[in-house]
Amino acid sequence: MNHTKYLALLAGCWLVTACENPVDGDLNVDDLDAYTLIYTVNAVEDDSKSTLTFPLERDTVFAVYANLSCIRDPESDVTVEFRTAAELVDAYNEEKQTSYAAMPEACYTIDDTRAVIPAGKYVSSPVMIRLNSAAFDGVGTFLLPMTIERVTPGLPVSPTLGTAYLRINGTYTTNPFRPIDRSGWSVEGFSTEEPEAQTGYDDNGKASSAIDDIPCTYWGTQWRDAKPGPPHWITIDMGKSEELHGFTIRGRADPFTSDTPKASGNPRIFNVDVSDDNASWTRVGTFTVENRIENEVYLDHKATARYFRITVTATQGDMYQTCIADIEAF
């Protein structure tokens, strides 16, 4: 049988599922050992094998396995040693057009990087990665490459399934952060505003209404004469540098003093940028939200800044105008 065709057949049929029933008979193959490979099932293009989202209220573990594919059983234990490979993150991001950050060492602990495939078996004991939730600085996804470093005895490693690119992120079940005191906040700038006084609320419509501690008043962009569409932006000066984990954005209500969101115009997609000097800006998040009266969003990674800018790029109902009733940071 042609060696190349046989290897392709073996890879397609056995590599991922492992060789549960090694063959002892004559397959007209010159070198059965040439079809023996070590790999990790966590390297397979299957999110269930390589991704994890876990609640940041508690620590958790992620298991990585070594696997054996063969025609003839090696008849001995196989020890597979893994190592983390942060140096592979940049190449992965370039190939996949992603921008994952390498997982910081403080975020995980691996007690033993060795996995043993017992004689007669084709799946190893797990390598347990213990995730330290307290070290995660947001809900962003970290990339942790785990590569097969050494195999004893010296069996070959699959060139395509020898490294698992683990993508791990946390979520908050409830918000653990306190709102930042807004007493020193001010509006530093905005795209447009449309004053629209309501009975008892003379400043309604102005940009300052987005931070006035009155949930029914709102900042509204122009609509009477000029009717500019998105993007609409507002810049807030917090008065001093603060550590930011996320924001709560309240939309305009209809009726005015209710908790029912207006059917159109509230933010649907918005960017958040931060700055220390109101001149040089860094993008820290882009968010898509539903038309709820309040939306809570978390940064991928915490940021420290004095200024933040919210830029609405699309609105509910694709209306040209937008409104924000209240902005809180935490």
Region spans (language model):
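Trp- and acidic/polar-enriched beta-sheet ligand-binding modules for extracellular glycan
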Residues: 258-330
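Short proline/glycine- and polar residue-rich coil/turn motifs
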Residues: 115-123, 288-292
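Extended extracellular/luminal ectodomain segments enriched in beta-structured repeat modules
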Residues: 229-231, 239-248, 304-306
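Acidic/polar, low-complexity intrinsically disordered N-terminal segments immediately downstream
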Residues: 20-110, 118, 122-124, 135-142, ...
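Disordered, acidic Ser/Thr/Pro-rich linker "stalks" and the adjacent N-terminal cap
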Residues: 165-237, 252-264
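C-terminal motif of bacterial Sec signal peptides marking the signal peptidase cleavage site
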Residues: 15-18
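A short beta-strand element within beta-rich, extracytoplasmic domains
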Residues: 242-260, 310
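Short edge beta-strand/loop segments characteristic of extracellular beta-sandwich folds
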Residues: 65-69, 130, 237, 250
